[in-house]
């Protein structure tokens, strides 16, 4: 089905952007992505960061190559996560699909607190910078800095931020931006309760429930992970639930302070399902990582641990200084991805160099259905396309196609932390997995990009043309 065919679906020709979908089922049936947009950042910041455009069309002669590279006008940004100006939430009853399309990438610099707006419509392989929001605008109007996650919601763009104004430690929170002008409107939080740390943001859109998670303040991360703070259990370990209408804090769910860094939020895509998954980077008790499900329990929110991934023993001499005293490699679950049909959860183990697939049809009883190994602190496993080339880094930012058949991932976590866990260099690479009809994952031997193709930058988040499994939310089942 072409984009034009899809626009004619149900007779509503061109009444909204054809990449907006009313339901997860519709999204999965849409045309596959032909391009991926990838955040590429310079470390050290001796040149501008960029958005790399990668050809993902297997029938294309330039498949699995960088076909566009838009450098930004400043240095020192550290591109990290980014999102679209508009998406399927525009089709919600509270949305307005008449005045927008999936055209602009909203790209924050997590170091600089600048936010770039890039137009992908005129030439999709060469996005053009159309506006730059300076850090002073975010600080003055919202009281925040160090922007992280961007989500397109009905009414506003929601952008989580780690720091207070001007890079101060906090509290962090969520800034609201205008969909059309990209002006910063202000803080989301009317009453933040006991929330101080920030990281990710997402929601149960039909229920008017917003969820946020916790990483750290800027001073706790920008010069690297601080071992004393980690062992002192000072990094984030709580989830926060909010009323989207009143913008008031409703409830805090503490996972336990041994579970340090509760990061990525992946709510079910089916709006009738009021649960979601969150990944925890590390337990200070045994270096394990874990996956939790948040859910309702007698009218309150609760969280249940459903997956534990143990650390892997390793000789001290093979470990970076940060880990030598522990004699083990922590999995370091730093990203997760949930397929649009809510069936498979993908878990990045950046430390051990493994990407796991779980069947989460029953979210309280996940079953591992697939695994691949690549990179890793100790293993340094190669990609099948280059079997003689050991790789640093490991599966990190993971993105799942809308139809659930393809999984893309990159290998850098965060500039200052890359050096601590991979002190001899993390490199830069991106690869893709194919998903079996009944589960299971395997490398696409044709899809492996590394090194010079990214022009001396490291790579982090991937966004797929037309939306992906972590870009859109839906109001209809």
Predicted regions and their residues:
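Structural signature of eukaryotic scaffold interfaces centered on beta-propeller domains
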Residues: 9-32, 78-101, 143-153, 202-208, ...
């Amino acid at each position: 089905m072409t984009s034009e065919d899809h626009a004619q679906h149900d007779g509503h020709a061109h009444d909204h952007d054809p990449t907006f979908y009313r339901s997860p089922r519709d999204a999965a049936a849409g045309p596959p992505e032909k391009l991926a947009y990838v955040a590429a950042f310079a470390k050290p910041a001796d040149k501008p960061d960029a958005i790399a455009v990668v050809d993902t069309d297997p029938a294309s002669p330039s498949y699995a190559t960088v076909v566009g590279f838009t450098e930004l006008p400043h240095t020192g940004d550290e591109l990290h996560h980014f999102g679209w100006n508009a998406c399927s939430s525009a089709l919600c009853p509270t949305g307005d699909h008449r005045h927008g399309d999936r055209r602009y990438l909203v790209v924050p610099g997590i170091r600089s607190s600048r936010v770039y707006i890039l137009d992908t419509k005129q030439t999709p392989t060469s996005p053009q910078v159309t506006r730059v929001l300076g850090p002073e605008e975010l600080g003055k109007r919202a009281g925040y800095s160090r922007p992280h996650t961007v989500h397109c919601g009905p009414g506003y763009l929601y952008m989580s931020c780690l720091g207070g104004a001007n890079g101060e430690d906090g509290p962090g929170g969520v800034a609201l931006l205008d969909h059309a002008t990209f002006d910063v409107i202000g803080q989301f939080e009317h009453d933040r309760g006991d929330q101080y740390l920030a990281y990710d943001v997402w929601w149960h859109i039909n229920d008017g429930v917003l969820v946020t998670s916790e990483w750290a303040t800027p001073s706790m991360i920008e010069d690297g992970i601080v071992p004393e703070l980690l062992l002192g259990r000072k990094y984030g370990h709580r989830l926060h639930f909010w009323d989207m209408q009143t913008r008031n804090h409703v409830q805090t769910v503490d996972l336990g302070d041994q579970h340090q860094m509760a990061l990525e939020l992946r709510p079910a895509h089916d709006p009738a399902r009021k649960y979601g998954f969150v990944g925890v980077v590390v337990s200070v008790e045994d270096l394990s990582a874990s996956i939790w499900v948040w859910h309702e329990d007698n009218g309150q929110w609760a969280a249940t641990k459903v997956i534990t991934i143990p650390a892997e023993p390793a000789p001290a001499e093979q470990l970076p200084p940060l880990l030598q005293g522990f004699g083990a490699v922590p999995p370091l679950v730093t990203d997760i991805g949930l397929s649009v049909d809510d069936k498979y959860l993908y878990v990045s183990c950046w430390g051990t160099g493994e990407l796991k697939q779980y069947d989460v049809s029953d979210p309280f009883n996940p079953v591992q259905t697939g695994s691949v190994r690549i990179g890793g602190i100790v293993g340094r496993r190669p990609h099948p396309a280059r079997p003689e080339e050991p790789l640093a880094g490991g599966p990190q930012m993971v993105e799942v196609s809308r139809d659930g058949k393809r999984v893309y991932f990159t290998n850098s976590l965060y500039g200052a932390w890359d050096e601590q866990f991979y002190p001899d260099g993390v490199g830069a690479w991106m690869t893709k997995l194919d998903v079996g009809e009944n589960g299971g994952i395997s490398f696409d031997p044709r899809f492996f990009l590394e090194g010079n193709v990214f022009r001396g930058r490291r790579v982090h988040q991937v966004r797929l043309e037309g939306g992906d499994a972590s870009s859109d939310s839906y109001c209809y089942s």
